[in-house]
Amino acid sequence: YLYSGIYNRKREQRRKIMKSFIPKIIGAILNFIGLFSATYASKLALQLFSKPRGGMLTPKGRLFLDTGSKTTLYYNNLAIQTYHWKGSKETVLLAHGWESNSNRWRYEIEKLQKEDYDIIALDGPAHGASGSDTFNAILYSEFINVVSQKFKPTVFLGHSVGAMAVIFFLQKQTYSDVNKIVLLGAPSAFTGIMERYKKMMGYSKTIDKGIDTHIELKFGHPPSYFSTAKLIKNIEAHGLIFHDKKDPIIPYKDALEIEAQFKNAQLISTDGFGHSLKGDFITEEIIK
């Protein structure tokens, strides 16, 4: 048994080491391609960034989501899968994060149901049962707009990039029904996410600049424009910002940057909840 335990630990260590090398290997390949065509290599790098490798529904997840009524909406011929649990109180919209799906909210949904809230969850682009081959927060915000026009939520709850997409939607669209916004582990700026990706992959300066150029051509703005902290300053709704001080994915400083601009919001800092921010304390604060 002792030998087996040591062997398994060493195997896990080797697996983690190999996993950490894979991004650098892919980055080196794209850097090499960039020597011949920087435009093509940069486009591939952005496509790689935009394609989730997780977030599909499991059989167990499907069983839970089947307890809600399902409606498929569309944006530019892309399917938007929604799940609805009816209640008599305010309508709450739930937007999950990267490589996740609506089942991520199971615990929160069960708690909100007990309080008789009307609940709407949607699968983001290229996640769960929704359409698209690629994901970005701008497209996600358009999905949220379509869902909001139909179900008229007054409370928005977003996790990670789902929180960012909620703010992009509220800033861009004319939507006056929002009363409360809850942000869980939200990134303050797209540039921070992109810089961490570029560093992880080890991209050259040529590909680095090429990615930024592709983003501006595709979305009409440079990466620096897409900032939760900047875009949130004109939003009047009340808000709660949850962020763990030891979040390994989105730095805690992002929450401080958002709080500084979100005039009607309260920052609730946690310690030990990680990036997922799941637990009784979180849910109880949300439904107060």
Q: Where on the chain are the PLM-derived regions?
A:
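An N-terminal hydrophobic leader/cap segment in hydrolases
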Residues: 19-72
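Conserved alpha/beta-hydrolase
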Residues: 102, 109-131
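Alpha/beta-hydrolase active-site loop
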Residues: 134-153
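Gly/Ala-rich beta-loop-alpha elbow adjacent to hydrolase catalytic centers
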Residues: 158, 162-166
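Hydrolase active-site cap/lid region
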Residues: 173-221
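Short beta-strand/loop motif that positions the catalytic acidic residue
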Residues: 235, 241-243, 247
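Conserved alpha/beta-hydrolase "acid-adjacent" motif
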Residues: 248-254
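Catalytic histidine-centered segment of alpha/beta-hydrolase-like enzymes
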Residues: 273-282
